[in-house]
Amino acid sequence: MKKMPMRKRFGQHFLHDSFVLQKIVSAIHPQKTDTLVEIGPGRGALTDYLLTECDNLALVEIDRDLVAFLQKKYNQQKNITIYQNDALQFDFSSVKTDKPLRVVGNLPYNISTPLLFHLFSQIHCIEDMHFMLQKEVVRRITAEVGSHDYGRLSVMAQYFCDNTYLFTVSPQAFTPPPRVESAIIRLIPRHNFTPVAKNLDQLSHVVKEAFSYRRKTVGNALKKLINPSQWPLLEINPQLRPQELTVEDFVKISNILN
C-alpha cells in the first residue's frame, strides 16, 4: 500500500517507533469490551495495536486522503468505524456504545488546546483519555499552583480531570520529526469536584480574564468582574497573582458572579 503524503496544515507527524507504540498501548490498557475513539489515526500505526486488544474502535480523521487509505486498509475489519470529521466539531456522544468512551490519539499540536477544551465540553460521555501532546502542553496541564507553567489550561484541565504525566517521547519516534519533544498524558474525568462551578462558561471567562493579566494582582486583573468588597467574602487575598490561585479559588470567584 503506497504511503500517504503528510499535510503541514493538519500538523501531521506520524508515530513509527514500535517500542513507543507498545508503551502507549500498555498505558491505555484497553479491554475487549471497551469502546475506544482514536483521534487523528494517521496511517494506523497505533490503530493496528489497538485492534488486537479492543472489539469496538472508532477513528476520527479529517484528512480525506487518509480516510480513503484507512478504509482500504481496514475494509475487512468489522469492529472499526471511520468518521471523516474535524475532531474540533465532532460530537463524541454520537459514537454508538453502552459504555463511556475511552479517547486516545496523537493530537495535532496546532489544535491540541482548543481540542482539549472541546473534549471537556463533552466530558460526561468519556471514561478516560490518553494523548500524545507537545511536552510543553503536558507540563502546562499538570502544572502546580505558583509554577511558571500554571495558567488557564492548567486550571480548566484540573477542574475537569485528574491528570498524569506518563512519559516523554523523542522527536526521532516520528516521521517527519517535530521540532519539539512530545509526552504522553492520562486524563481521567472528575465527577465530584468541590466546589462545583455553577456556570462553566463563567468559570472559563474568569480564568481567561485573570491570566490575560498574569503579572497583575488578581484584584486588578479581575476589577471589571469583582468589587473590592467581595474579596473578603471569598476569603482570597486580592494581592495574589493569578498563578497563585488554586482551581478552587477560581471556582469560588466564578460562583459569586452568578
UniProtKB/Swiss-Prot annotation:
KW Transferase (keyword) present: yes
SUPFAM superfamilies associated with the record: S-adenosyl-L-methionine-dependent methyltransferases (SSF53335)
Organism, scientific name: Coxiella burnetii (strain RSA 493 / Nine Mile phase I)
PANTHER family linked: DIMETHYLADENOSINE TRANSFERASE, DIMETHYLADENOSINE TRANSFERASE-RELATED
PROSITE patterns: RRNA_A_DIMETH, SAM_RNA_A_N6_MT
Family classification: Belongs to the class I-like SAM-binding methyltransferase superfamily. rRNA adenine N(6)-methyltransferase family. RsmA subfamily.
InterPro entries: KsgA/Erm (IPR001737), rRNA_Ade_diMease-like_C (IPR023165), rRNA_Ade_Mease_Trfase_CS (IPR020596), rRNA_Ade_methylase_Trfase_N (IPR020598), rRNA_adenine_dimethylase (IPR011530), SAM-dependent_MTases_sf (IPR029063)
Binding-site residues for S-adenosyl-L-methionine, renumbered to this chain: H13, L15, G40, E61, D86, N106
Protein's UniProt keywords contain rRNA-binding: no
Subcellular localization(s) per the UniProt record: Cytoplasm
Reaction catalyzed: adenosine(1518)/adenosine(1519) in 16S rRNA + 4 S-adenosyl-L-methionine = N(6)-dimethyladenosine(1518)/N(6)-dimethyladenosine(1519) in 16S rRNA + 4 S-adenosyl-L-homocysteine + 4 H(+)
Stated role: Specifically dimethylates two adjacent adenosines (A1518 and A1519) in the loop of a conserved hairpin near the 3'-end of 16S rRNA in the 30S particle. May play a critical role in biogenesis of 30S subunits.
EC number annotated for this UniProt entry: 2.1.1.182
Cellular component per GO, a single term: cytosol
Gene3D superfamilies the record matches: Ribosomal RNA adenine dimethylase-like, domain 2, Vaccinia Virus protein VP39
Sample GO molecular function, one term: RNA binding
Name this polypeptide is given: Ribosomal RNA small subunit methyltransferase A
Entry-linked HAMAP family: 16SrRNA_methyltr_A
